[in-house]
């Protein structure tokens, strides 16, 4: 029997001679192996949307939040007509102008990001179907009935098995193909249609991530919305160097899971140290609480250079492309485990495990695509290599740091090439005198990109020098991070739905993204701390979730130890890895469905319209750097959720900014078209520094649906943070005070005095049930 095949035939061939039918020529189609889709909810208008299907919704958003372009290059070099200069109104040989070219590059970035997550999810689902079967159930327990809110809304599919996730990924891959084809020379020519396609790519990215995370949650028995998920050890200082150390870098949990399985089966969990960097670190700690998290990707080069790891396992995404060179310098062994990162290595997958171990001990690196073999190979190699490297020195000692610093000519190229313009030259000048104050400061804030080294005319190992000083002076690099809990439970949504929609909970702040921070990880923790204290709900994923854990209060406690892991006011929720960003969007969708009874199935625009107008949530990608982050942010934007980027986010080339004037909405209760406050004011915007970011958050959590009490709550926080960080009232406060009822009682006198100075007038009317779908 072949699944999904159609059989067509002439029914006359089936008739016996006893049956007389004149001109009977009937075609019939018989479907094998596919069950009828369960009618769990009436199908909405847009299941499996194609590129143009939601274009009307995109254009509604783009009319209110037109793209603002910041070209970092005026040239187009994508075809052999070029390179074409698009500055000063010029067109390229194909006819594109600079606006369309910038939008095209944004689309390409979003397609790369979406393809990355779709490829990751496809690998997971394919591997898990191979090992567990296509009928393996998707069961998140009794407390989660809406298990796949994005899939339900976008595709109309309610996935019940791993096999159902294949259908979702088939759709994702089809859409990515069409989207990427639109970026070819001589295809799309309008910047707004490029943006609509970028928004579509972002939505596909969101959907692909949900498929991948659902698969790994059910297959590896990861936490299923557990607010009391275990606290995991985090930081350089928690790694036990007396044991063989295996370091996993990347995003794919499969190789790491086999290492943990081999250790458990052979009762060696306490003999070998397993740790991780980036999202693989988060996901292996969702499988078991034994592994440890070194930190976000900003700590990758420093930790590898430290020489602690005996075996380095790389899978996919956000891995330094020179990782092989860096690992071999330390005498460690590298195993590449994913087809997306082969690093020019010999494929040893066909060998048996003992042969592979021998090969690695001789050659120090190999490509091993059979993940089932990674467990034994990594552990046994680590045990041997750890003995070989026991006394190996990989970093200069402090005296050598001084001698190296003396070679510095203080030319200043390091400062100029640093993405954050850190004072590397000044740290060198102090180190010449044996004063490491500059390097101590650098260690806390440095991203570890290595650009200072790349441009140094004396070839000084600046990152290694910084790492050594950090190791010597920071003895307590031990933190705690709550393991990624996955989705938000339905009962939590029922508890917070009304307070969020009406504004009594002032907002949901989602801290996500990479670690290209302008000033170190602590700024992410400071943002989280500020809004936890103000009883916002704070959710986190990926590198941001790790960064939040890398700060302690005066009592030595991290934010994860101080605040509960529940999705409630004052709760700090670590959803998990990059894939787990889907649960943040999913929570907003579930508010629309569980609280407001908005149907999900194939009903994207209505759900997104509800979120835009009623769910006070904002994403903060303070260290966003990758194409994946671009796709994540753009996907969130299509749902109607605003995003704040760090200062490096301007390099994505495009923001969605309103003009700050009044918006128009329709009140569904009266049918009137009303002019209202600009809420939320922008859809994606950058902040120059952390103070500016903190002050943007309360403003971007405002929604037209806020009750007077809820809006007063949000205005209180907006005014309070502005006075705290800038010592004055917000310069645009008058835009967001609709009537006197919106003014918090304890601030009424000073706010009224300010409004009188501004010539403020109350809105005559504001909507009870706002929508932009008219």
From Swiss-Prot:
Q: Which residues cross the membrane?
A: none
**Residues engaged in binding [4Fe-4S] cluster 3:** 408, 411, 414, 456
Which residues hold CO?
117
The 4Fe-4S ferredoxin-type domain, residue ranges: 398-427, 436-466
Where [Ni-4Fe-4S] cluster binds, per the record, is at 251, 279, 318, 514, 543, 578
The signal peptide here is none
Q: A Pfam family in this protein?
A: Prismane
**What's written under domain?**
Cluster B is an all-cysteinyl-liganded 4Fe-4S cluster; cluster C is a mixed Ni-Fe-S cluster which is the active site of CO oxidation. Cluster D is also an all-cysteinyl-liganded 4Fe-4S cluster that bridges the two subunits of the CODH dimer. Contains two additional 4Fe-4S clusters, dubbed E and F, that probably transport electrons from ferredoxin to the B cluster.
| PANTHER family found in the cross-reference section | ACETYL-COA DECARBONYLASE_SYNTHASE COMPLEX SUBUNIT ALPHA, HYDROXYLAMINE REDUCTASE
Functional summary from the UniProt entry: Part of the ACDS complex that catalyzes the reversible cleavage of acetyl-CoA, allowing autotrophic growth from CO(2). The alpha-epsilon subcomponent functions as a carbon monoxide dehydrogenase.
Full protein name: Acetyl-CoA decarbonylase/synthase complex subunit alpha
The lineage, from the top, is: Archaea, Methanobacteriati, Methanobacteriota, Methanomada group, Methanococci
